[in-house]
Design a protein with these regions (language model features):
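Nucleic-acid endonuclease domains
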Residues: 1-171
Length: 171
């Protein structure tokens, strides 16, 4: 049981909040309450991409894309928390269940504090031709391996997302 008052969360930076959240997730996992530590990753990555690219988040009902770029580009966002070096399985993204987007932005966040480790924008045709359909997940699976993240047609967005993340730290 928590004694006294809970900490003043408003006093924490965003990375400080994520570090605290990570510690909570680790404890819940050690107790068998949860099985993974990826809970807030997708929402946070979508938020960062929308902020960094000056876009807007898709309505919750939209299934094919997550962010509408300021140029009308439909972007699917996939994210994972990774340790350094990445452990087996950490690079497998959630399945693509449709390809109704123009590009996918793949975001890898540090397990320590959710800082952006790597981010790449990959054209849909590259994702579609590389992802492998898996019936048991009813979708196409892609791994955020170097050959995808550094694909000749991919755009490295690491610095752009880090700048958006850094700008949010001062809020």
């Amino acid at each position: 049981m928590l004694s006294g008052q809970p900490p003043d969360l408003a006093a924490f930076s965003e990375s400080g909040l994520f570090s605290l959240y990570r510690a909570i997730l680790r404890e819940l996992k050690s107790r068998g309450v949860i099985r993974t530590e990826n809970a807030p990753v997708g929402d946070y990555a979508e938020y960062l991409v929308a902020t960094a690219l000056g876009g807007r988040l898709a309505p919750n009902a939209e299934k094919a894309w997550d962010v509408l770029g300021n140029d009308g580009e439909k972007i699917q966002v996939k994210a994972r928390v990774v340790s350094g070096p990445a452990e087996p399985g950490q690079l497998q993204l959630s399945p693509f269940r449709s390809f109704g987007f123009d590009a996918a932005v793949i975001v890898l966040l540090s397990a320590a504090d959710y800082a952006v480790s790597r981010a790449s924008k990959v054209p849909r045709h590259v994702v579609e031709s590389t992802a492998v359909y898996r019936q048991h997940v009813n979708g196409s699976v892609l791994f955020a391996r170097p050959e995808i993240m550094g694909h000749p047609e991919a755009t490295d967005l690491t610095a752009t997302l880090r700048a958006a993340q850094s700008g949010r730290e001062n809020v």
